[in-house]
Amino acid sequence: MKNILVTGGTGFIGSHTVVSLLKSGHQVVILDNLCNSSINILPRLKTITGQEIPFYQGDIRDREILRRIFAENRIDSVIHFAGLKAVGESVAEPMKYYDNNVSGSLVLAEEMARAGVFSIVFSSSATVYGDPGKVPYTEDMPLGDTTSPYGTSKSMVERILTDIQKADPRWSMILLRYFNPIGAHESGLIGEQPNGIPNNLLPYICQVASGRLPQLSVFGGDYPTPDGTGMRDYIHVMDLAEGHVAAMQAKSNVAGTHLLNLGSGRASSVLEIIRAFEAASGLTIPYEVKPRRAGDLACFYADPSYTKAQIGWQTQRDLAQMMEDSWRWVSNNPNGYDD
């Protein structure tokens, strides 16, 4: 059993990972500034897990609160989700993203070292591959040219953590590059909070389904794919959460930098996602095909074989379950955690 600090632990992926950690017998402390989440998730996490979870409201750039957390809790490892994640916003406000995502991660690493904690699992992204020109994506591909400050911030943090580990071999840096997380916890109690216009496909579909938006915009119908729409590797958020736990358990005591893809190894198109959601919900999702967005790729997906060999993890939940769990969450919580 380990005591894990989860930064961004009330966010979408962070909250589901908290559930997985507790289910696996670990203890958890959450740090979150609630800029993209809700305090109302905490009683729901208690309902799911049966445990009161220590929570600190604060920012990873705040050294004082980090020092207080490390002084008051015997932390063994950190799973680091805290960061801004809207691609479009990052293009408009790059300084905000580099300050939060890059400077924040550096402050966190410095305070971990000060406290004698040398194990971190970092929430990275497949965006660090850029456009390598071939699929599937494998961990030995070089870092690519990212298409947004969001993606660049993830790539920069990967480089920073890798350099820190080279200089100080006590560190275990676990860099998890994940693809497109969707779905929700099977209880319907936690899921993705619908704040504003969604950046990702499934939350957009869910807002149309719940009547918050009139129709779905499908960007690009002329890609070189079977139905002309973009294809992505979708992964159930609980599979993703379990991947974080598996990586932490397998590698947190193994010094080095560990790069791992977290994906299913399968690509699904936008129209396939729409049809799967319609099948799960019994609804019809109106959509309009619009021009491609700049920087969007036709198709990408993970090669998950290295990850399976390293930590014994692979996805368990199929597209139908992703849709069923998403629809349960949305239909039970049309306003997210504000109900």
UniProtKB/Swiss-Prot annotation:
A GO MF label: UDP-glucose 4-epimerase activity
Database matches in CDD domains: UDP_G4E_1_SDR_e (cd05247)
Record GO biological process: galactose metabolic process
Record's catalysed reaction(s): UDP-alpha-D-glucose = UDP-alpha-D-galactose
Protein family according to the UniProt entry: Belongs to the NAD(P)-dependent epimerase/dehydratase family.
Listed transmembrane segments: none
Entry-linked Pfam families: Epimerase
EC id: 5.1.3.2
Chain sites annotated for binding substrate: S125, Y150, N180, N200, L201, S217, V218, F219, R232, R293, A294, G295, D296
GO cellular component: cytosol
InterPro entries documented for this protein: Epimerase_deHydtase, NAD(P)-bd_dom_sf, UDP_G4E
This protein's name: UDP-glucose 4-epimerase
Subunit structure: Homodimer.
Binding sites annotated in the UniProt record for NAD(+): 12-13, 32-37, 59-60, 81-85, 100, 125, 150, 154, 179
Stated role: Involved in the metabolism of galactose. Plays an essential role in the incorporation of galactose into meningococcal lipopolysaccharide surface molecules, which are important for pathogenesis. Catalyzes the conversion of UDP-galactose (UDP-Gal) to UDP-glucose (UDP-Glc) through a mechanism involving the transient reduction of NAD.
Active site, renumbered: Y150
Enzyme class, first EC level, given as a word: isomerase
Cofactor or coenzyme needed: NAD(+)
Keywords in alphabetical order: Carbohydrate metabolism, Galactose metabolism, Isomerase, NAD
Pathway as given in its UniProt record: Carbohydrate metabolism; galactose metabolism
